[in-house]
Amino acid sequence: MTPSQGAIHREQRRQAWAIHGGPVGLGVAALGVALARLPLPSRRLRERLFRTVFGKKYPPGLNEAEMDRPLAEYPTLNALFTRGVRPEFRPIPAGTPQFLSPCDGTVQDVGRVERGRILTLKRIEYTLESLLPGTDTAAFEGGHFAVVFLSPIDCHRVFAPQDGELHEATHVPGSRLLVHPPFQRAEFPVYTLNERVAFRFTTPLGPCALVMVAGWGVGNITLPAAPDFRPRQRELATKTWAPPLPVRRGEWVATFELGSTVVLVVPPRDEVTPLVSPNDKVRYGQPLFTYPG
């Protein structure tokens, strides 16, 4: 049963209080998106702030060697979150029958699609129809899924998991509940309650769906291939590419402004081998599933 809006709002307040610590923390959290876009005037201030904040809260901190520019050249927190990565640190395997990780992060769940549903380790069940509105979900029956959580120190760009074509991106309005695993509860199925953008691809291995789920503090989800696609938070909207947009594995397709979670759903095939397990750290371009062939 879907919780009421009142229950969702109460849960949002409870989560925010728990993670940010009282009314002051709630106020800072509410201003988080604006603060993340606030320019930091001094290069020295940026370096000290970024290293201190991320090093203490998310050890071992930021991997500066792989960033696409020096740390002091990111003028805002949002610019740091949405940074690129030097390509030599993300080699993309060419021509392999595999679906690759679409992002950096930590694997939360890996499993099978059964009876049109996915079941997470926290025993929260999601139907593909609710996760991917308007998609022919029957094509994924018996397939696999992976859920990757992006922490604040991860690169917040999202990439194509296989060669193929991008057909559409659908913005689904919703809430902004926390997606961090300790805060997930069965009464509030965040992947279908929260605002999200669902992408539909075709690939040589079959259809593929990728869902970017917004969480607490996410400012926006942007698409390099459609910079004008900025639907309102409460608006269901679809961007369709006709003809479909060719994409290469490892090609940048979208960005979280701040961060959240990506759900990847891949098609059924005999002898598909999952290559990762829950709690594994992954980088974009790293193989998640190998297909026979």
Give the positions of each predicted feature.
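Contiguous, well-folded functional domains in the mature portion of proteins
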Residues: 1-293
